[in-house]
Amino acid sequence: TLCGAMTQDIDERAKINTSRSVSAMVAIGIINIITVPLIGKLGSQSAKTGYLLVAIIYGCIFAACHFFCFAKTKEQVIMPEKEKISIKVQLRAVMQNRPYILALIGQVLFGFTLYGRNADVLYYFTYVEGNASYYTTYSMCIIIPSIIGAACFQPVFRKLNNKGRTASIFALLTGISMLCMFFFNVKETPAAFYTLAGITQFFFSGFNTAIYAIIPDCVEYGEWKTGLRNDGFQYAFVSLGNKIGMAIGTALLAALLGKYGYVANQVQNPAVLSIMRHSFTTIPGVLWIVTAIVLFFYRLNKKRYNEIVEDLKKNRVK
C-alpha cells in the first residue's frame, strides 16, 4: 500500500515500482551468488549451523531495511477519514472496479504460473537434463537479464501510457520465449537454451514490475467509481489471489507427478519426464499468453487516470 500513499502521479509510481523491482533483482542475484559459499564458511563443522546462521543474518538485514523504509518514507496522499467498513461492503466495491478485477485475475494466473514452474525447475534439471548442477548455471544466466528487464518497464510504459497493456506485452513475450525453450536443452544446444532462458527472464522481470505498478492506480479508480477508498483491502485481496494461484499451481504439479509414478532419486518413467519438461516450458508458456490476453483489456490509461485524480481532488475540496 505504500506506493499508493506516497504519490498520485502515475509516472512517479512507475519510477517507484521500477526502483523496487530493479533493487529486488540485484538483491536476488547477490543472494544467489553468495548464499552457498556463505553457508559453507559459517557452517564449516555443520551444514545445519551454516543454514541457521545465514538465515539469522538475512533476517536481521531484512528487518533493518524495513525499519529504515518506515523511518524515511512519508505518505503524501491524504486519506479520507471514515468509519470502519465491513468486508461485505469492500467486496461489493471491488467487484465494481473493472481494472482491479483484471489485475486480480492477472495475479492469480501469475501466482499459478510462476510458482508452479518454480516448483518444477529443480525436477527439470535433475531428471530431464540429468544434472542438478545445471540449475546453478541457469541461475547465473538470468541474473543480468532480470535487472535489465525490470528497468525496461518504465520506458515501455512511457511509450504505451497504459500499465496493463505494458504488462500484457511483457507477458506475451515471456510466453513465446518459454514456448521456444521446449525445442532446446542443455546437453545438445546449451547456448540456445541459456540464451532463451535469459530472454524469458528479461520479459518476465518487465511483467513483474508492471503487474504490481497497476494496483495503486486501481485504488484511485475504485474511489472515483464507488466513493470508497480501501488501499489495504485491495492490496491484501490481490495478494490473496496470488497466493491462491501459487497453492493451486504447486499442488497440481505435485499431484500429477505422484499420479504418474514419480519416485525421488530414481530414474523416472517417460510420463513423469514429460510432465516435468512441459511444466518448465509449454504449460507456463501458454498460461503467460492467457495472462497477456486478460491484461490487454485493461483500459485505465494515463490520460484517463489523470482525469480521475483531478475529479477526486475537486470532490475533496468540495
Question: Which residues fall in each region the model found?
Answer:
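Juxtamembrane helix-start motifs in multi-pass secondary transporters
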Residues: 54, 162-169
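Helix-loop junctions at membrane interfaces in 12-TM secondary transporters
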Residues: 183-197, 207, 212-213
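Hydrophobic transmembrane alpha-helices of Major Facilitator Superfamily
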Residues: 112-116, 202-210
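C-terminal ends and interior cores of transmembrane alpha-helices
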Residues: 172-188
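Intracellular loop-helix junctions on the cytosolic face of multi-pass helical membrane proteins
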Residues: 1-132, 279, 284-318
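Helix-to-loop junctions at the C-terminal end of transmembrane segments
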Residues: 148-165
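Glycine-rich segments within core transmembrane alpha-helices of 12-TM secondary carriers
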Residues: 17-38, 62, 139-143, 237-257
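Intracellular juxtamembrane helix-capping segments at the cytosolic ends
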Residues: 1-8, 206-226
